[in-house]
């Protein structure tokens, strides 16, 4: 389609240039007269040499027009075409780069979301682990304190029991000494023993 348009344009330019040059040459003749439609052909081609002259003038004019107008115009159009193609290519490259950057940005955003979620999950897991360790440590310490308290209570209890037994033995020895020294009768001995037992039971009750 483009080649056909160029060909039509060239032939149109050729015909227009030929008739323009012919009219110019006819108008420059010595006997200037009005050009009529019936005498145009005779004026243009009165003989063979005039025809050759017209043809040479036409080719000269065509050559000048090609070199002075057509080729510079073609160069300008080609340069313009190349510039537009370069701009389109650059725009496509920029669009491609923009799409790549957008895709990379989306990928980095998704990775950042994944990493942040992993960090939050890890922090929650570590917090739960720390809470569990603190609870276990607190339970161990509480159990240890309870055990130590029970040990202390049991130790105090044994100590009080041993002290009570020791005091009971000492009281019994004192009572025996008093019985021996006083040498009282059997009834007095019975009363003294009953009193000693009551005192011993009272001491044990106070210890408990």
From Swiss-Prot:
A lipid is attached at residue 28 (N-palmitoyl cysteine). F(1)F(0) ATP synthase produces ATP from ADP in the presence of a proton or sodium gradient. F-type ATPases consist of two structural domains, F(1) containing the extramembraneous catalytic core and F(0) containing the membrane proton channel, linked together by a central stalk and a peripheral stalk. During catalysis, ATP synthesis in the catalytic domain of F(1) is coupled via a rotary mechanism of the central stalk subunits to proton translocation. F-type ATPases have 2 components, F(1) - the catalytic core - and F(0) - the membrane proton channel. F(1) has five subunits: alpha(3), beta(3), gamma(1), delta(1), epsilon(1). F(0) has three main subunits: a(1), b(2) and c(10-14). The alpha and beta chains form an alternating ring which encloses part of the gamma chain. F(1) is attached to F(0) by a central stalk formed by the gamma and epsilon chains, while a peripheral stalk is formed by the delta and b chains. GO terms for cellular component: plasma membrane; proton-transporting ATP synthase complex. Belongs to the ATPase B chain family. A lipid is attached at residue 28 (S-diacylglycerol cysteine). It is found in: Cell membrane. PROSITE patterns: PROKAR_LIPOPROTEIN. It comes from the Bacteria. This is ATP synthase subunit b. Residues 1-27 form the signal peptide. Gene3D superfamilies: F1F0 ATP synthase subunit B, membrane domain (1.20.5.620). Its main location: membrane. One of its GO terms (molecular function) is proton-transporting ATP synthase activity, rotational mechanism. The chain crosses the membrane at residues 49-69. Keywords: ATP synthesis, Cell membrane, CF(0), Hydrogen ion transport, Ion transport, Lipoprotein, Membrane, Palmitate, Signal, Transmembrane, Transmembrane helix, Transport. SUPFAM superfamilies: F1F0 ATP synthase subunit B, membrane domain. It comes from Mycoplasma genitalium (strain ATCC 33530 / DSM 19775 / NCTC 10195 / G37). It is a single-pass membrane protein. PANTHER family: ATP SYNTHASE SUBUNIT B, ATP SYNTHASE SUBUNIT B', CHLOROPLASTIC.
């Amino acid at each position: 389609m483009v080649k056909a348009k160029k060909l039509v344009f060239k032939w149109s330019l050729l015909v227009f240039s030929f008739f323009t040059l012919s009219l110019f040459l006819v108008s420059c003749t010595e006997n200037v007269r009005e050009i009529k439609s019936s005498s145009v052909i005779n004026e243009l081609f009165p003989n063979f040499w005039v025809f050759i002259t017209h043809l040479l003038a036409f080719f000269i004019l065509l050559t000048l027009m090609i070199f002075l107008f057509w080729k510079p115009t073609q160069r300008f159009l080609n340069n313009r075409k190349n510039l537009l193609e370069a701009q389109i290519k650059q725009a496509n490259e920029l669009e491609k780069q923009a799409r790549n950057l957008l895709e990379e940005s989306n990928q980095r955003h998704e990775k950042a979301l994944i990493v942040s979620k992993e960090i939050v999950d890890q922090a929650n897991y570590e917090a739960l682990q720390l809470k569990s360790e603190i609870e276990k440590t607190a339970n161990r310490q509480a159990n240890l304190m309870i055990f130590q308290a029970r040990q202390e209570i049991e130790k105090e209890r044994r100590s009080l029991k041993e002290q009570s037994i020791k005091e009971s033995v000492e009281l019994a020895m004192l009572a025996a000494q008093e019985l021996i020294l006083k040498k009282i009768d059997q009834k007095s001995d019975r009363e003294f023993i009953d009193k000693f037992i009551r005192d011993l039971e009272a001491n044990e009750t106070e210890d408990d």
